[in-house]
């Protein structure tokens, strides 16, 4: 993927996507033992070995899939622009699906300790207050909390668009969050 496309993604505010593309490319070139891989060097066998390398490095299936999908996207752009030869079912032998993972929730005891244990410093007290607020705002992400504006609050309801997905959200403010 040319650097201009990475720049375009960043200009569009898609920093996370650009970051994932960068990581996938870096990982693949590292696996190949070079700083640049030509499209003709990307084969079904090399991709299969790369997938095995990722798994043996301790990566989870969804991470391996993400890297493979990024490489496939780069390859497809190369084919569309005429810079890469079309290879039928090039990514057929590698995993590009998405595993449904069990959400990782804190046990109740740990959550209580996080939210209510007396912090050892003022800095930790502030961090604890922010964590409690995010929890009371239905698990709002820190990025979303940081981008909230006063205009987002209307009659005990916060309305905002998720930073990552632009999905509209509405969260009722609990009485405990007003303290």
Language-model segments: residues:
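N-terminal DNA-binding recognition helix of tyrosine site-specific recombinases/integrases
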Residues: 27-30, 40-42, 56-90, 138-140
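Glycine- and acidic
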Residues: 10-11, 52-60, 128, 159-163
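Basic, Lys/Arg- and aromatic-enriched nucleic-acid-binding interface segment
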Residues: 86-142, 146
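Conserved tyrosine-mediated DNA breakage-rejoining catalytic core shared by Y-recombinases
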Residues: 147-179
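Hydrophobic (often cysteine-bearing) scaffold residues that line and stabilize catalytic clefts
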Residues: 17, 21, 63, 67-70, ...
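Basic/aromatic-enriched alpha-helical hairpins
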Residues: 1-57
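Contiguous, well-ordered alpha-helical segments that form the cores/surfaces of helical PPI scaffolds
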Residues: 51-52, 73, 131-136
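Conserved helix-loop functional segments at active or binding sites
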Residues: 56, 80, 113-120, 151
